[in-house]
Structure formats: structure tokens, C-alpha cells
Amino acid sequence: MATNTSVYRLWQLISPNLPVGAYSYSQGLEQVIHTAKITDEAATMNWISGVLEHGLARTDIPVLLRVYYAARKGDDEGALWWSRQLLAMRETAELRLEDLSMGAALLRLLPELGVPVPASELPFAAAFAIGASAWNVDPTDACAGYAWSWSEQQVAAAIKLVPLGHTAGQRLLLALGERIEGAVTIASGLDDEELGMSLPGLAIASARHETQYTRLFRS
């Protein structure tokens, strides 16, 4: 049986077992559920798919692509420049902290797995791109995998918080999976000056979550 180790490395990067603490964050989802703006499966789908298509597709994923190609060329300065652009797109301290915390965790892990990393703090998408590039993961597959991993974490949070049953969670993942190719296509077609998107609802939810009295997820 022929094997493609780059596929397995992608599975490793998107695994819930990757020790970067992704399970600790809800990206504002906890707050909108707390205020009863999301109460069922349909509303959960509307929120997550909206952030995927209007947020990740125009921020994280296109930056991931640019850092991937910079890493392929050994262009640490280019990778760092795009990383800073992504951090500048974060609209709250909570979202920035999450990004840097997960990025730092992956940057600590990658050298233990034989992947050299630049001596800079990077957001998670950039660290992910460096790992994917080093392991020769197809760039389109890397983008789709990143989007899937993010979607899976959001659904896991919703299952706990709404709450939703696990069958509902699987229906959500099935539906979100059908949106990922479109999100990657959007991201792949953006010119540099087109990157970036403001999501006021997400920004407000994240800012309010920072001071929410009781919460399961980090801020």
C-alpha cells in the first residue's frame, strides 16, 4: 500500500489532540449563547458558517497561504510581515491573545517534531502554515484542513454551550464541510490588498466575553 506521509502530517496538524489549547476558546460563541442569540442548531450553523465565509476566508486562510509560500522560499521576513498583518486584523484583545497563545504552543511543538521555526511570535495560522510547508502538505489541503479544524472546535463548543446533542453536532459538521471548499476558493482568489474583514458581531461578542461573569472558555 502506497502512503502519502504529508496527508498524515496534515491529520496531525488538525487533530484535536494537537496540544495547542484550541479547546479552551470559543471566539465569542459563548457570549452570544449566553445572551440567547443562539439557542438551536440552525442559529449555530448561521453563526459558524458566517464567521467561516466572511471571516476566516478573508483573514486566516489567505494569510496562511502567504506564510506557506514564504516558508517554502525561506523568507522569514515575509512570513513575519504577513503574521503581523493577521494580528492587526484581530479586533479584540481576547482574539489576539488566543491567536498568540495557540501560535506559541505550536511553535514550541514543531521543533520537537523536526521542524525549524523562526524566532518570532506568530499567530496560529502562520505557525500552522510553517508546519504544513515543512511537511510538504498541499497548500489547498492545508487551508481546507485549517478551516475544518476551526469548524470542529466551534461545533464542540456549541455542543457544550447551547447545548446540542452529538448527532446535531455531526449534522453541523456535515453542513460546514460543504462550505469549506468555497471558503478556500474565496481565500485563494484574493489579492493582497483585499485581505481583511470586520465582523462587528463577533468583535462585540468577544469583547463582552472578556468580562463575562461566569464562563467555561478562556478570555
Task: Provide a role label for each language-model segment.
Residues M1-S219:
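Metal- and O2-centered redox machinery and metal/ROS homeostasis
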